[in-house]
Amino acid sequence: MRTHYSSDINEKLQGQKVTVCGWVHRRRDHGGVIFLDIRDRTGLVQLVFNPDNDNFKVADSLRSEFVIKAEGVVNLRPEGQENKNISSGKVEIIGDSIEVINKSKTIPFQLDDFQSTGEDVKLKYRYIDLRRPEMQHKLITRSKAIRYVRNFLDNNGFLDIETPFLTKATPEGARDYLVPSRNFNGKFYALPQSPQLFKQLLMVSGFDRYYQIVKCFRDEDLRADRQPEFTQIDIEASFIDEAFIMSTMERMIAGLFKETIGVEFATPFQVMTFADAIDKYGSDKPDLRIPLEFVNIKEDMQNEEFKVFSGPANDPQSRVIALRIPGGNDKLTRKMIDEYTKFVGIYGAKGLAYIKINSLSQGKEGLQSPIVKNISEETLFKVIDKTSAKEGDLLFFGAGKAKIVNDSMGALRAKIGEDLDLFNKDWAPLWVVDFPMFEKDDNRLYAMHHPFTAPKVSSVEDLVNTNPEELSSRAYDMVINGYEVGGGSIRIHKQDIQAKVFNLLGISDDEAREKFGFMLDALSYGTPIHGGIAFGIDRLIMLLTGTTNIRDVIAFPKTQTASCLMTEAPSTVSLEQLNELGIAVKKEER
């Protein structure tokens, strides 16, 4: 039907006859001449109909979002009427004929006025929202990114192999989406949270290098950057080590950013241990564009009478830190400090102590804070020296249980960095490595990543003889600008070590056999050393397109309650369907 997209129309086509198709983006009547901006996925082109044209009445009857096909001759725009904002802005099409393919009702919101439209309305009419050039750009970028990744992995010997969606329910940290079986009454499939076990089994099968662009599902409470169904770049390889995965993935991600948005990353990426990341930034996914670091002052506060600091300073499970904000005296108002105090409270902090450094030559008198009177001058100036604080700086303090301090002050660091625009560069990719194998909660061990991550031991004897809480894993996360974009590990490839890890996690031999028997069996039939990584496509596209809303980069996303406002899913099903599956719905008690 068409000969050209809108973006193809330029001065090189002057005098040529073209056919375009698209939506009426805007209609204007200037002195009896009809000007139409026609929109397709590539942009806009101006179509002009003069009153003496046989199709003038049709052009005059058009309204926003009508779908049309038009023929005409490309002409240079009159001098001074060029539009530098669009690729076809030097030319216009003098219309010969026009056909209305379909009319449109008045749309529920104007495409140019989307910011004043509630997100619920945009999600209900998602097919309208997706007509916006900004939204189309994000999904086109997504398509280009996935194409680049496929080409890179294909060219590096990885095989695209599909794994099942209907599989066995296994615990991986979040709730499974369950699918009832009609053939096996009372039994259920689970939608995969990841293809983890299947990709490991492909390594046992000898495929050596695997990848898949795959949907995954998690029935969990949603955050702003989470969806119940999400897309992974899933990768696994055999006879490799951490260095192979990290160097290969650096090349892939660096190439992806250069190809899609023209950004060049220096390689190799910075590598930071988990312990250093927590110690300096309170987070295992630090945003290194922000030049603020924690300074440990635990030892300095141990002998002070100020219990708010000395209590945690003498508790092995706690920490006391200072965070210097250069020029913070002028940049942070009393109102902002009060807001930050409320902010850290979200993470369990009981308060937010601070000191303003007005004058270093006046001793205590040059320091402004409610806490100054409670701390000796010697200790105060030790802290000032440790933090390299200068006049005009402000110090924030975190004191308490280590997790609360890390979470609250890590979040505060990120917030202040954004509020004060402290970013010293545009991009900061890094690897975080040497994660603990386990984390403890309610006196029980949990896998920091997942139960198939290899510990840094060479035998089951080493595993048995090491305190589980002191074990490191062979895991690695890629972090860009404070987002964990990918996570992976070298896997356990020996059956005895895998069985022992299950045991340490409180999974009995019988339970392990019932849930993971097929995997344990596979490990006994000659399993190579193998490892891999998975990248969240959605988060990568968020970074590539500069959005903070994950729903912007998914064509048909769910809300934060995991519902689809457009299709009204989830929905009830007929009693006949439920009976066929042997399911009875229990009514919610009120």
From Swiss-Prot:
Residues covered by region (Aspartate): 196-199
Chief location of this protein within or outside the cell: cytoplasm
Enzyme Commission no: 6.1.1.23
Keywords carried by this UniProt record: Aminoacyl-tRNA synthetase, ATP-binding, Cytoplasm, Ligase, Nucleotide-binding, Protein biosynthesis
Cellular compartments annotated: Cytoplasm
GO MF term (any one): ATP binding
Positions contributing to ATP binding: R218, D219, E220, Q227, E484, G536, I537, D538, R539
Binding-site list for L-aspartate: E172, R218, H449, R491
Catalytic activity field: tRNA(Asx) + L-aspartate + ATP = L-aspartyl-tRNA(Asx) + AMP + diphosphate
CDD domains: AspRS_core, EcAspRS_like_N
SUPFAM superfamilies xrefs: Class II aaRS and biotin synthetases, GAD domain-like, Nucleic acid-binding proteins
Complex and partners: Homodimer.
Annotated function: Aspartyl-tRNA synthetase with relaxed tRNA specificity since it is able to aspartylate not only its cognate tRNA(Asp) but also tRNA(Asn). Reaction proceeds in two steps: L-aspartate is first activated by ATP to form Asp-AMP and then transferred to the acceptor end of tRNA(Asp/Asn).
The protein's name: Aspartate--tRNA(Asp/Asn) ligase
Species this protein is from: Francisella tularensis subsp. tularensis (strain SCHU S4 / Schu 4)
Lineage of producing organism: Bacteria, Pseudomonadati, Pseudomonadota, Gammaproteobacteria, Thiotrichales
